[in-house]
Regions:
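Helix-loop junctions and short alpha-helical segments
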Residues: 1-20, 47-137
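Polyanionic, low-complexity intrinsically disordered segments
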Residues: 3-9, 13, 17, 115-213
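Short amphipathic alpha-helical segments and their helix-coil junctions
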Residues: 20-38, 134
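Short, hydrophobic/amphipathic alpha-helical patches that form generic packing surfaces
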Residues: 28-32, 45-56, 153
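Short, surface-exposed loop/turn segments at secondary-structure junctions
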Residues: 37, 62-65, 168-174
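Helix-start/N-cap signature of alpha-helical segments
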Residues: 39-43
């Protein structure tokens, strides 16, 4: 499902201003990814911004959740509305390819970098258990738990790119950027489509509403 189809579907819906702005922003970044064909760094970043536009909610001081917990809660809500099992089908079809490659890539496993920086003493045992858990969650159709692992890896990759931890178009991290892009380009349109269908769900307020002056 491309940005053109999503935009057409959005125009056909009557949504609240808050929800319409959220989805319009998310679709615009999918369009950006499509326009930058062949530029994996920019495409992945654009798709992450699109994803971020979907799950970003209003932050309320000290009661705000961490970003990781916030998008886990968001994904759990999406899965409830995924009556066609699109998330599971995506993970099942892609597990032998980009999903498995990403999950088993130590360079997008946050504790590996914490160990490298001397912040923790060990990372290999937890990494092995995480990989084993991913296989188990797939076999038991625990979609939310598997997505949490995948998104955790993607979040680490996002941090590397957004915080200057990687060289643009570098050969060093091509495999994880390519796998991340191949997952996000399929995952994000599903998220937007579900949010569009279940527009009466409370998806929260957007962080930066349009201010009329």
């Amino acid at each position: 499902m491309n940005s053109q189809t999503l935009s057409r579907n959005l125009k056909a819906k009557t949504l609240s201003e808050n929800h319409n702005i959220r989805l319009h922003r998310a679709i615009s970044w999918i369009k950006c990814a499509e326009k930058n064909e062949g530029n994996l760094d920019v495409q992945f970043i654009a798709l992450w911004i699109s994803f971020n536009a979907c799950y970003a909610v209003e932050i309320n001081g000290l009661t705000s959740k961490s970003e990781r917990l916030k998008f886990k809660t968001f994904i759990d809500k999406l899965i409830i509305h995924d009556s066609e099992n699109r998330f599971y089908n995506l993970l099942w079809q892609k597990f032998s390819g980009p999903v498995k490659m990403l999950v088993e890539n130590q360079y997008v496993y946050a504790p590996f970098w914490e160990y490298t920086r001397g912040e923790i003493n060990e990372w290999e045992n937890s990494f092995r258990k995480s990989c084993e858990s991913a296989h188990r969650f797939l076999s038991k159709e625990k979609v939310g738990d598997l997505l949490e692992i995948v998104l955790d890896r993607l979040y680490t990759l996002r941090n590397q790119l957004m915080h200057g931890g990687a060289t643009f178009n570098s050969k060093v991290n091509r495999s994880q950027v390519k796998d991340g892009y191949n997952i996000m380009k399929l995952l994000v349109p599903i998220i937007i489509d579900i949010m569009m269908q279940y527009d009466t769900e409370d998806w929260g307020n957007i962080n930066y509403p349009i201010i009329v002056v």
